[in-house]
Amino acid sequence: MNRRGKIKYVLRAKVKTRHLKPSYTLKKRGFRRHKKTFGESRMKSVLIAKSIRKNLKYLRKYAKISKNSKSETAAWICDNFYTAEQSGKSAAEFFKRKFRLSDEIFDICKIEIQEQQNDREQDIEKLLIKGLCSKSEWFDCQSLTALPAVLTALAIDLCKEGAQKNDPSKAAKGIELLARLRSVDFETIISRFSASEKIFSADPSGDYLKMTAETRAYYRRVCADRAAKRGIREEQFAKTILEKAKNETDPRKRHIGYHLIERSEQKRRLYTLGWVFVAARAGLPFVISSVIGILTGLWWIGWFIYIPIHELLRPFCEHFFARLSHPFFMPKIELYGHIPKAEQTLVAVPCLLPSPSGAKKLCEHMEELFSANQNGHIGFCILADLKEAAGEKMPDDDARIKALKREVKKLGEKHGGRFFLIIRKRVLLKTQNAYAGWERKRGAVTELIRFIKTGRSQFIELLGDRKFLRECKNLLVLDSDTRLSFCAAADLVSAAAHPLNKPVVCKEKKIVTAGYGIIAPIVSTESAAACKNLFTRIMCGRGGINAYNSPCANAYQDMFAVTVFSGKGLINIDAFYECLNSSLPIERILSHDILEGSYLRCGLCTDVELLDGCPSSMAGFNSRQNRWIRGDFQNLLWLLPFITVGGEREKNNIFFLNKIFLSDNITRALNPFTCLATIILSAFVPLPYMYFALGILGVASKELFEFLKAILTGSFSSLSQKYHCRVLTKTSYLILKSFFGITTLVTSAAVSVSGAVS
């Protein structure tokens, strides 16, 4: 019998863990071995991270070998290993940041572990507060933030010691401690003993104490990091920030966050990194396509292969620069899910007036929105347009209007008048030679905001409390198939209410120069929409909302603190009226969302997520793509230094970055056509296989890159599912989507050309 078989035999028969190879432990080779550098002076955090990973590796091996054992220790470890692994990985990730931990914090955590071993019923929070009080009155933010991670590391070490010695009591104490740590309010402890918390509480604007706990923690972390880079004490740096804020007269600059976040070296570094990212994305494909053209003697072929190379390199560039930056954090004011009077909000759903049978379904959707977001000063409005017709009035208009009014009145009576109905009249659209709502969705939002600001309107129906509408400060615009998650509206408003996010409008240029006129959420595909048929499963993947919302990566938002507006988000009514009331030409814009984001400055709130529908057929998908591409080519006028509005030539004041957003859309729109052209050209030029592969990879590069990343990060287990589910696994979805994109390349190219020339 070999050694491995002997280990398995001994563990299963007698569960004697001494036969396992001893691993790196906090006591033997971690904390105790490095006592001089950690216990007395300080120990590098990377050593703690290493010890956690070693202990988890040991526990994983123990759980695998002893899964059939009847020992009590094995039962504790095997049943709770995934809990320990999850907590341990989070702690190890925390300690990857290179900082030094104070002696006092580690001593307090050791005492805490000893007390818990003696009496498991003792309150962890009270013991920590008692220990902190006995050591010092104030602590630096880094040490306090490390409390849960250090306790987790020690608890995992206790579990591993129990496994090594076959001691069920130690294993049980370690597992129970990990479970109890999740219920400890560390934020309260950190706030109580943090030196920077006490100083920032004197914020001249008074906004610091109104912020969410996550935002205050972010401020403290930034303060600690900036102080460490300067080589000064955290308390000293916090006082410097406070003094700068006190010396300001501008309300925005009197908030400590302006000097801490807006004027930080980190923000300037990310801004510079962003322009390197933009230059790399545009320059690398140009260099590569030029070199290929020169080496092959076909200088003209660079025009065809530039875009395929651009799209091929896109995921690599985005991934590389995302690793150099960090997810953007959107600061928020604490609203506790209740929208205050000062931030009164209207949820507006622009749509076409439904048939009498569809009116009930639309109102049911509005009631769903209300059910998840009803706390505070918030209203819900159906902003309906009559369908396009040959005349100003049609015979079935009255029946449709009466049916929808009846359903909205029922909702108002049921929920206390929180629902509104606005119907616009038809006007002649000269460019289309038909009658419809003025400027369609853009016109509907613009006319609603004009009514809120002036009280004047040309609506044929306005059902609801006009006074409430006139007092609204924010407008949350959604589509008729968009679903709000619980308290999503309040979360967006809490971001908009923060002083750093309030829009600053340049009255001369009619553009937002700081803050945000639009706060946009993450938009995901609804699970039900993603599971309709094979087409939606291929195009949308799993769909659904992420149950563990956290800030996620978005290249432009992370580096430039601004993103592209996609049509769904919270609009500041005053900023919109001041910037876009009459700044855009009439009947010349189809894709207005990206332009609205360019004028109003759109910020992405990455921890708020909405659910949206998707086309259920190839025809519907191509129709939408054609419409978007047409709009993108119409927006090419905004790449010029001047635009024509109302017959007058005006200076184009949108930022250069927004022009990059516009050109980026054009590049994506032309990609199918250029990839198809490259594949066709491969039959007539030297090195045909290279050009053929380039055309194929240009279409499927994003999906293939994500597939490789999923395999490398999630191993081959990502190819299977651990439960029954109608949607595809991530890897299956990526493979099928790349294959689908290649097989439908001709159709996609035709849609691209049609949208460009129409």
Predicted feature residues:
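Loop-to-transmembrane boundary segments
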Residues: 140-144, 266-286, 348-358, 647-674, ...
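Low-complexity, highly charged intrinsically disordered N-terminal segments
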Residues: 40-83, 87-89, 93-94, 216-226, ...
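Catalytic core of nucleotide-sugar-dependent glycosyltransferases
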Residues: 22-23, 30, 536-555, 620-645, ...
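Helix-rich C-terminal or lid/interface subdomains of diverse kinases
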Residues: 24, 34-61, 79-89, 137-165
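Internal catalytic domains of large membrane-associated glycosyltransferases
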Residues: 159, 164-275, 328-655, 659
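Active-site acidic catalytic loop and adjacent metal/ATP-binding pocket
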Residues: 72-119, 474-476, 482-487
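Active-site activation/catalytic loop segments of kinase-like enzymes and analogous catalytic loops
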Residues: 104-137, 153-162
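Membrane-embedded multi-pass helical conduit in multi-pass membrane proteins
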Residues: 287-323, 667-758
